[in-house]
């Protein structure tokens, strides 16, 4: 399911940049649809996608390096607006007859550029900071291009050709370290390329609902596995809006959920969508499979395998209850655009990473996949969810791992330990919300060090309790993350409440590790 037919995409040509997906997100934040394609794409590939414009991403190479990624020169003859960024700026220069040289002045990090007119930087300070990351630099712009910015290490830090609707910058406008970067990118898209800003949550929701109707048809039936997370909830809400009670949502309670999550799905999701919901209580089955298991990967595998078996049983029940003569042919999944790109979808394929499929279903049950969110980024999914009327408690929910609290208990998972962690997690989430910090942090895993005991003093006696770890992080995409600097008074309140209210916990510690080197989750 794709939105290409309704929106001519701005194609982000990926030269191996870590920021290609981020560029695509920034284009969409400007209100214009975008997709990522590999640099190996040909002019015919671009024509086939009916592109509205091209953005050439950065990359780690020199344009003169052996095997450096190159651009099909015919693409620049298609008459499309083109915007080059960093390596893409240099590749564009090279292809159009300009000069890229090793000036001997590398620039990495925050750098001052001096602006000399032009559309891109109109209204900005004559000297302002941007984020650079380059060795080579453009020393001479292609014929017909006007140089509009320079820096100490880049004689040509930006250029424009309004007649050809082409422009480029040596720096990275897509990162937050370039404070005016979003404005510069938006000015290219609207002022130079002349594109309409019609990519909105309302339009997206309306188009996706119609496409689901087309795919499933007037009589088709579908099943959707709800995890309690944002993606499956929004996917389920979209499909329910499209086909009504021909959708059955299945929620497996594996006992590894946080406080209130089952109730949130059973009450809030159903109330907001009117969806038909089947809840399967598999708590004891999961606990029995996790008994004695302490190794993190073994936990994940045990939880994953048991979830498949639980979902199989739920699907069998739904199939049995389907009206006589009807079948359930479609499986709804919350696959997002980054999953499609990472699995090869950016090059025109439709591979889905295995962990996004419900594997292990019976051989005689074959579903056609319905993936209404496969063109969307996470922030867009949240916006669509709000447009569909889902409560903020669902659409604003922090990311939560599939194995749940099972991988936030360091040690064996038992019912008592789950209750301990669930209580501590609820306190932390409540205090962060009351302090107005939900919009500041990406997520805050709360971890129980169940195999560790620390000595403490509570009341008049010595205690040997477990430590709780708080792991608040800030991120845009979870690929990298920094620990969040929470106010001391909030940390104090969380710590005091947890050590006073949660049995067997006498210490709260703060994880101040960034990613890399540490991952967001402990297991």
From Swiss-Prot:
Residues that, per the record, bind ATP: 227-233
Domain GMPS ATP-PPase: 199-397
SUPFAM superfamilies listed in its UniProt record: Adenine nucleotide alpha hydrolases-like (SSF52402), Class I glutamine amidotransferase-like (SSF52317), GMP synthetase C-terminal dimerisation domain (SSF54810)
Gene Ontology cellular-component annotations: cytosol
Pathway noted in the entry: Purine metabolism; GMP biosynthesis; GMP from XMP (L-Gln route): step 1/1
InterPro entries xref list: Class_I_gatase-like, GATASE, GMP_synth_C, GMP_synth_GATase, GMP_synthase, GMPS_ATP_PPase_dom, NAD/GMP_synthase, Rossmann-like_a/b/a_fold
Glutamine amidotransferase type-1 domain boundaries: 9-198
Annotated catalytic residues: 86 (nucleophile), 172, 174
GO function term, MF aspect, one: GMP synthase activity
Keywords carried by this UniProt record: ATP-binding, Glutamine amidotransferase, GMP biosynthesis, Ligase, Nucleotide-binding, Purine biosynthesis
Presence of the UniProt keyword ATP-binding in the record: yes
One Pfam family this sequence matches: GMP_synt_C
Enzyme Commission number(s) from the entry: 6.3.5.2
Reactions mediated catalytically: XMP + L-glutamine + ATP + H2O = GMP + L-glutamate + AMP + diphosphate + 2 H(+)
Function: Catalyzes the synthesis of GMP from XMP.
Oligomeric form and interacting partners: Homodimer.
Record's protein name: GMP synthase [glutamine-hydrolyzing]
